[in-house]
């Protein structure tokens, strides 16, 4: 059994995705989230958008909902010091261990989507799918 990658390697992998830049559109993330069973559809979400004040607004909403007894997830970007700041559950940052686990799980799922094996006349052939997530798409999938 191969050794699990370290937090440092997981973060390095995430930042390596920045080479794919920003790609407009939702097709890739929708396709990928569908392969995960559309986890976003099982959540009640508040999407905060705009130019200024998103972080403060989200922190306020998070605080109010936690005090009201809700389980609250918060996904923000960018982070200030550590990547872990981007994903919080009930005010607590995601752990290094959980980041490593999620990066590996999503990498494997992408690999499965890219190289599905198809049985054609008793010959196994790899079938390539173009599913390369950007940094933002990958980290969004982690949050779900």
Task: State where each predicted segment sits.
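ATP-dependent carboxylate-amine ligase catalytic core
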Residues: 26, 30-41, 67-144
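Generic hydrophobic secondary-structure packing signal
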Residues: 6, 54, 136-139
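Short functional linear segments
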Residues: 1-50, 57-59, 63-68, 75
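Short active-site-proximal "capping" loops at secondary-structure junctions
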Residues: 52-54, 79-80
């Amino acid at each position: 059994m191969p050794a699990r990658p370290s937090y440092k390697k997981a973060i390095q992998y995430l930042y390596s995705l920045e080479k794919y830049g920003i790609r407009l559109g939702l097709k890739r993330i929708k396709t990928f989230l569908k392969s995960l069973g559309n986890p976003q559809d099982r959540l009640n979400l508040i999407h905060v958008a705009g130019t200024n004040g998103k972080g403060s607004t989200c922190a306020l909403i998070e605080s109010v909902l936690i005090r009201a007894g809700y389980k609250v997830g918060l996904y923000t970007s960018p982070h200030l010091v550590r990547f872990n700041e981007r994903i919080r559950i009930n005010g607590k940052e995601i752990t290094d261990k959980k980041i490593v686990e999620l990066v590996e799980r999503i990498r494997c799922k992408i690999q499965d989507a890219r190289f599905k094996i198809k049985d054609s006349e008793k010959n196994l052939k790899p079938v390539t799918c173009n599913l390369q997530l950007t940094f933002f798409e990958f980290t969004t999938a982690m949050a779900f």
